[in-house]
C-alpha cells in the first residue's frame, strides 16, 4: 500500500523511496560499519500513512541512534550488548539534513545547506538577531571572505547529542523557534565578534578563532556560545559578590543577582560578614534572624528570574565555618527540620581555614562566633584575615577571640561539625568546600585584596570586594544620584582546551589564541552591572580551563589509577601553565599589562618561586613577565564544561566518565550514549567515576593545582557502601594535597544539578 506523507507546506504526496534512500546514503557516507539498507528497512517498519516529513525524519534519526547499542548473539546463544559509535554520526547527519531544510525555508532560499553568508548577516542584523557591528565594522568584501572560509564539512564532526544540544540551545532562532543559523555560522559569528578588537587584523583572527572552535579543539563558555554576536552580548559565565552587614548591601546584591541571572549568568555570594541569629541590632539584643532569611531571599530571586523560562537562576552562598549560623546553614538543602529555614535552590559552600582542619584532625574543639560581635568587641573583622606559610594572622586572631571573655563563642567538637558536613554532602551533594587559607596564600594579587569565596562551580579564585552606599543626593531637577563605595565584583570569562581533540604539539599555538580570545571577551563584553565592568578592567581576569581530560588519558593509553597518570598530569599542566603565562605576557607587550600588575606576585616573581619553577625556561619567563608585565591578573581555572563538552563529543572538565555507556530517556525517547571513541581497546582504559579509587583523583588534582593560579571544579564520587571514615579521609587528603576547592560530593544514588552558565 502506498504511504501518503504530509509535506511542510501542508499538501500530501506519496512517500518517495528514492528520496529516503538518498538521505540515508548521505548520512552513512564514509561510515563503513553502518549499513544504509539496514537503517532503511528498520525505519520503514515504523512509517505510517499521514506522517509528516518531520516525523519521517525523526523516525530515521531515532532508528539510527537506537543502533548505537544493540543486542547481538555472541555465537553461543547469549544476547550481549554490541556498540557501534558510528550510528551516532549517522543520526547527527540525518538531523543536520533537517536543519539544512529548515534553514532554507526560514532564510527563503532554495539551496541545500549553507547559503550566502553576507545575505544572512544583513538579514539577521535587520531582524535584530545580530548586532549592528557585523555590518558597521566589517565591509561587504570581508563578510564575503569570511563566508567563503566557512567549512560546512566540519558539521560532520558532531555526534547526534552534540549537534542536537547546539541546535536546541545556541543557534540563533526566531520567536517561534525557527532556525536562522547553522552550526558553522554560529562559530563564525562568535569568531567575528571576538576578533572585533583586533582592528586591521580582525579577519585574520576571526579565521583563526573559527578554526579552533569549528574543529572542536576548544569550547567556549555557555554565555559566549549563546550571546556572542547578538544585540545584548553578555559573554561572562559567573560572578561573585560580597555582602556587607547592612540592609542596603543585602538588597543591592539581590538586585545584582537578578540582573546577572536575567542574562544567563550565575552568582557566588559571600555572606560571612552578616550577623548571626539572635545577634543584636542597634543594641537591641536577640533581634537578628541570622543569615537564613537573606539566603531565602536570594533563593526566591533564583526561582523568579528564570532566564526566559529556560532554567532557574544559579547561586552559591558561602559562609565561614566559624559563623554561629553554621549548623542551620549546612542543612540548607536537606529535608530535615523546619522548611521555613531552608533554601532548596541555593547551593551552600563552607569556607574552611587551616585551624579547623588541624583541630578536627587532633579531635579538638572549635569555637563558633558572631562576626558582628567580633567587630564590636575587637574592632576588626576576623574574616578579613588569612594564614600563609610564613604568617598565621588568621589563626592568631582566632585564638585571641577564643580567649576574650567578652565574646560569647560556642565551643563544639570539630569532628561533630565535620560529620554534619558529610551527612549533608551524602544527602544533597553539598556544601561545597572552599579552603580559604590555601586559596589566599596562593593568590597572586593579594596586594590588592582578598579572596572570600568562589563562584557557583568553584573554579574561580579572585579578589572579592564589598559595595556600600556612600550617599544619596536629591538633585534640583528631581532626580536622585546614588553614590557608592565600590568593591570588586568578580567576573568569570571562561573557555577550555579540548584535550581529547588536540595533540601536545598544538598546545602552545592554541593556548595563545584562546588567551587572546578571552582577553577580547573582556574588551567587548556588555557587563550586567557596572561593578563587574570595573573589576574586569582592573584585573582583566580570565579562566583558561580544560575539557576532555579523561578522553586525553585514554587517547594516550593511560589508566586513571596509575602513577603514569600523576606524572602525565604534572607535565601536561605545567606546559599549559607555561604557555598560558607566556601568551599573556606577549599580549602585555602588545596591549599593556593589567592595571593592578604593580606589586603583584607576577611582578615580584614570587608566583614562580612559590611553585618551584626553577628551570631555564621558567626563569626566562619570570624575567620577561617582570619586564613586560602580564595582560591578565588571573589566568587559569578549570570549569566543569558539562554541556559544552557534549557538543565537542569529549569528556567533561577534569572528571572521569560517569558511565561507559548508558541509555538516557527524555520525553519518551531513548538515546544511547557512550564514552568518546569507545571501542574494544578504549573500553578497558575507561574506568567509571564511582568505581575509581578517589585517592587517585585527589593526587592528580593536587598535582594539577600547583600549576593553576585559580582552582578546579573538582568532584568526589562516593557510593552508598562507603563508610564515614572513608569519606572523611577524602576531605582530609584533599586538604593535605593543597586542593583549593571541592565541588560536588557525587553520591551514586543522587542526581546533581549542573551549572549551565559555567560550562565552557
Regions found by a protein language model. Give the residues of each.
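Terminal amphipathic helices with adjacent charged low-complexity linkers/tails
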Residues: 75-124, 164, 439-470, 542, ...
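Gly/Pro-rich turn-and-neighbor structural signature
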Residues: 178-248, 394-424, 428-433, 573-623
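Conserved oxyanion/phosphate-binding beta-strand-loop segments in alpha/beta enzyme cores
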Residues: 149-169, 197-230, 258, 691-702
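Active-site cavity-forming subdomains of large catalytic enzyme subunits
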Residues: 98-137, 145-153, 236-486, 490-496, ...
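Core structural elements
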Residues: 51, 56, 66, 157-173, ...
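Internal maturation/activation junctions in enzymes
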Residues: 212, 254, 510-533, 541, ...
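Core nucleic-acid recognition elements
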Residues: 34-188, 204-210
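Catalytic alpha/beta core of large soluble enzyme barrels
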Residues: 132-134, 139-151, 155-165, 456-463, ...
Amino acid at each position: 500500500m502506498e504511504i501518503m506523507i504530509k509535506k511542510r507546506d501542508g499538501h500530501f504526496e506519496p512517500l518517495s523511496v528514492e528520496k529516503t534512500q538518498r538521505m540515508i546514503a548521505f548520512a552513512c557516507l564514509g561510515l563503513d560499519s553502518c549499513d544504509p539498507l539496514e537503517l532503511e528497512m528498520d525505519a520503514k517498519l515504523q512509517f505510517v500513512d499521514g506522517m509528516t516529513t518531520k516525523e519521517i525524519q525523526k523516525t530515521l534519526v531515532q532508528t539510527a541512534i537506537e543502533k548505537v547499542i544493540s543486542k547481538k548473539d555472541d555465537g553461543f546463544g547469549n544476547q550481549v550488548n554490541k556498540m557501534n559509535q558510528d550510528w551516532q554520526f549517522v543520526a547527527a547527519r540525518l538531523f543536520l539534513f533537517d536543519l539544512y531544510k529548515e534553514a532554507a525555508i526560514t532564510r527563503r532560499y532554495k539551496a541545500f545547506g549553507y547559503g550566502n553568508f553576507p545575505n544572512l548577516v544583513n538579514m539577521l542584523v535587520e531582524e535584530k538577531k545580530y548586532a549592528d557591528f557585523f555590518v558597521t565594522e566589517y565591509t561587504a568584501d570581508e563578510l564575503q571572505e569570511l563566508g567563503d572560509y566557512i567549512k560546512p564539512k566540519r558539521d560532520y564532526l558532531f555526534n547526534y547529542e552534540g549537534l542536537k544540544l547546539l541546535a536546541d540551545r545556541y543557534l540563533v532562532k526566531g520567536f517561534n523557534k525557527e532556525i536562522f543559523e547553522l552550526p558553522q555560522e554560529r562559530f563564525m559569528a562568535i569568531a567575528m565578534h571576538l576578533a572585533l578588537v583586533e582592528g586591521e587584523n580582525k579577519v585574520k583572527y576571526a579565521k583563526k578563532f573559527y578554526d579552533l572552535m569549528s574543529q572542536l579543539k576548544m569550547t567556549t563558555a555557555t554565555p559566549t556560545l549563546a550571546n556572542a554576536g547578538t544585540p545584548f552580548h553578555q559573554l561572562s559565565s559567573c560572578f561573585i559578590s560580597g555582602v556587607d552587614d547592612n540592609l542596603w548591601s543585602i538588597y543591592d546584591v539581590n538586585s545584582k543577582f537578578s540582573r546577572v541571572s536575567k542574562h544567563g549568568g550565575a552568582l557566588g555570594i559571600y555572606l560571612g560578614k552578616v550577623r548571626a541569629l539572635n545577634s543584636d541590632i542597634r543594641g537591641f539584643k536577640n533581634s537578628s534572624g541570622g543569615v537564613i532569611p537573606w539566603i531565602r531571599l536570594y533563593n526566591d530571586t533564583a526561582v523568579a528570574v528564570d532566564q526566559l523560562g529556560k532554567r532557574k537562576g544559579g547561586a552559591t552562598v558561602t559562609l565561614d565555618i566559624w559563623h554561629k549560623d553554621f549548623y542551620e546553614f549546612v542543612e540548607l538543602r536537606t529535608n530535615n527540620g523546619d522548611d521555613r529555614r531552608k533554601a532548596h535552590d541555593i547551593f551552600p559552600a563552607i569556607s574552611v581555614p587551616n585551624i579547623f582542619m588541624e583541630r578536627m584532625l587532633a579531635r579538638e574543639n572549635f569555637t563558633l562566633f558572631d562576626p558582628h560581635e567580633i567587630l564590636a568587641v575587637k574592632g576588626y573583622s576576623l574574616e578579613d584575615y588569612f594564614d600563609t606559610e610564613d604568617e598565621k594572622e588568621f589563626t592568631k586572631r582566632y585564638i585571641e577571640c577564643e580567649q576574650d571573655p567578652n565574646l560569647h563563642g560556642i565551643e563544639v567538637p570539630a569532628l561533630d561539625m565535620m560529620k554534619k558536613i558529610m551527612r549533608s554532602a551524602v544527602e544533597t551533594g553539598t556544601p561545597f568546600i572552599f579552603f580559604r587559607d590555601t586559596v589566599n596564600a596562593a593568590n597572586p594579587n593579594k596586594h590588592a585584596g582578598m579572596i572570600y569565596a568562589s563562584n557557583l562551580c568553584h573554579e574561580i579564585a579572585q579578589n572579592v570586594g564589598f559595595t556600600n552606599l556612600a550617599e544619596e543626593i536629591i538633585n534640583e531637577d528631581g532626580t536622585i544620584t546614588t553614590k557608592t563605595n565600590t568593591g570588586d565584583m568578580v567576573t568569570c570569562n571562561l573557555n577550555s582546551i579540548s584535550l581529547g581533540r588536540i595533540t601536545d604539539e598544538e598546545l602552545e599555538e592554541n593556548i595563545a589564541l584562546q588567551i587572546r580570545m578571552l582577553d577580547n571577551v573582556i574588551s567587548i563584553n556588555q557587563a550586567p552591572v557596572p561593578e563587574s565592568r570595573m573589576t574586569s578592567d582592573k584585573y582583566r581576569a580570565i579562566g583558561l580551563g580544560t575539557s576532555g581530560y579523561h578522553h586525553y588519558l585514554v587517547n594516550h593509553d593511560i589508566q586513571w589509577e596509575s602513577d603514569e597518570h600523576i606524572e602525565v598530569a604534572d607535565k601536561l599542566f605545567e606546559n599549559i601553565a607555561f604557555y598560558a603565562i607566556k601568551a599573556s605576557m606577549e599580549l602585555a607587550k602588545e596591549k599593556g599589562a593589567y592595571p593592578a600588575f604593580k606589586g603583584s606576585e607576577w611582578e615580584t616573581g614570587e608566583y614562580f618561586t612559590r611553585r618551584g619553577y626553577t628551570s631555564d625556561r621558567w626563569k626566562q619567563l619570570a624575567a620577561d613577565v617582570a619586564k613586560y608585565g602580564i595582560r591578565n591578573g588571573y589566568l587559569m581555572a578549570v570549569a566543569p564544561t558539562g554541556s559544552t563538552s557534549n557538543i565537542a563529543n569529549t569528556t567533561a572538565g577534569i572528571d572521569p566518565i560517569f558511565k561507559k555507556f548508558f541509555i538516557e530517556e527524555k520525553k519518551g525517547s531513548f538515546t544511547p550514549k557512550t564514552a568518546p571513541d569507545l571501542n574494544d581497546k578504549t573500553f578497558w582504559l575507561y574506568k567509571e567515576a564511582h568505581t575509581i579509587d578517589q585517592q587517585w583523583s585527589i593526587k592528580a588534582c593536587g598535582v594539577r593545582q600547583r600549576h593553576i593560579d585559580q582552582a578546579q571544579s573538582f568532584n568526589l564520587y562516593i557510593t552508598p557502601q562507603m563508610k564515614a571514615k572513608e569519606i572523611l579521609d577524602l576531605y582530609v587528603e584533599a586538604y593535605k594535597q593543597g586542593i583549593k576547592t571541592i565541588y560536588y560530593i557525587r553520591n551514586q544514588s543522587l542526581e546533581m544539578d549542573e551549572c549551565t552558565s559555567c560550562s565552557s
